Amino acid sequence: MAKKLCFFLGCIMPNRYPGIEKATRLVFEELGYELVDMDGASCCPAPGVFGSFDLKTWVTIAARNLSIAEEKGYDILTVCNGCFGSLNEANHLLQENPELREFVNEKLAEIDREYKGKVKVYHVNTFLYEEVGVKKIKEKVERPLEKTDGEPLKVAVHYGCHLLKPSEVTGFPGSVEDPRTLDELVEALGAESVDYKDKIMCCGAGGGVRSRELKVSLHFTREKIFNMLEAGADCTTNVCPFCHLQFDRGQIEMKEHFEKLPPKKLPVFHYCQLAGLAFGMDPEELALETHEIDCTPVLEKLGLA
């Protein structure tokens, strides 16, 4: 019988990148997990924005989402750094602060809900690394991510901020200054993870920067793309739809703000999409054609187009 997890979709994935959702569902089914929909779930809400304006409102909304998973009786899986950061930190605060928990439950009682602190929030990166394991992922690979010349696909991984820090809350396995989990997960698919300058730098999108100061946010993105290409990457992969949007849409937006641009576009994949390809799934199943940056160059290198 498949193990069950509550699947927290967030906002960006279902609205902008449904292929990430499809890939995640397919990959987890292949790994022996059933992802259960959280009917009625709202925005996480975004920690850097909502939390900075009104901590109690932010944590109350997050607690409502947590209570939906508690009602179903399964831990939560997120595929977005922001959603993970919000739900996981709210869970931590409510378990550590009785006064805050009492306040939140008074509010939730008005809609016949209660936060009980009985579920754990997992990020897809950490769940795959610790709960599933690199060994099992390797065993599921039917089509290693190798180019037609026999060389492994070169992938530049992007971790993102809320996955790593604050480390005392995220529970990230290993060093947050020199993380390796996503690198190992990528290499389990038969690809090569390439090191590059400023690897753990922000993509530029978070904290409201993208919506408020787009050019500032794109400075980060442009620098990261330059660094990834310099390292010889064929593509970049991430574990967050917001980071994904910043790299995917951001490469299109750069031309409106900068004269000096990266020498070429770098295709962008969520990790579950790369895993789907390695597990033998068709590119069409993973909705790669919905990305802003054409993924065809990578598919051609893999002999899939």
UniProtKB/Swiss-Prot annotation:
Annotated pathway: Cofactor metabolism; coenzyme M-coenzyme B heterodisulfide reduction; coenzyme B and coenzyme M from coenzyme M-coenzyme B heterodisulfide: step 1/1
Name used for this protein in its record: CoB--CoM heterodisulfide reductase subunit B
Tagged with keyword Oxidoreductase: yes
EC number(s) recorded for this UniProt protein: 1.8.98.-
Disulfide topology: none
An annotated Gene Ontology molecular function: CoB--CoM heterodisulfide reductase activity
A Pfam family the protein falls into: CCG
Protein family (similarity comment): Belongs to the HdrB family.
Subunit structure: The heterodisulfide reductase is composed of three subunits; HdrA, HdrB and HdrC.
Record keywords: Methanogenesis, Oxidoreductase
GO biological process: methanogenesis
InterPro entries listed in its UniProt record: CoB/CoM_hetero-S_Rdtase_bsu, Cys_rich_dom, HdrB/HdrD_reductase
Gene symbol of the encoding locus: hdrB
Function text: Part of a complex that catalyzes the reversible reduction of CoM-S-S-CoB to the thiol-coenzymes H-S-CoM (coenzyme M) and H-S-CoB (coenzyme B).
Enzyme class: oxidoreductase
Claim: Oxidoreductase is one of the keywords in the record: yes
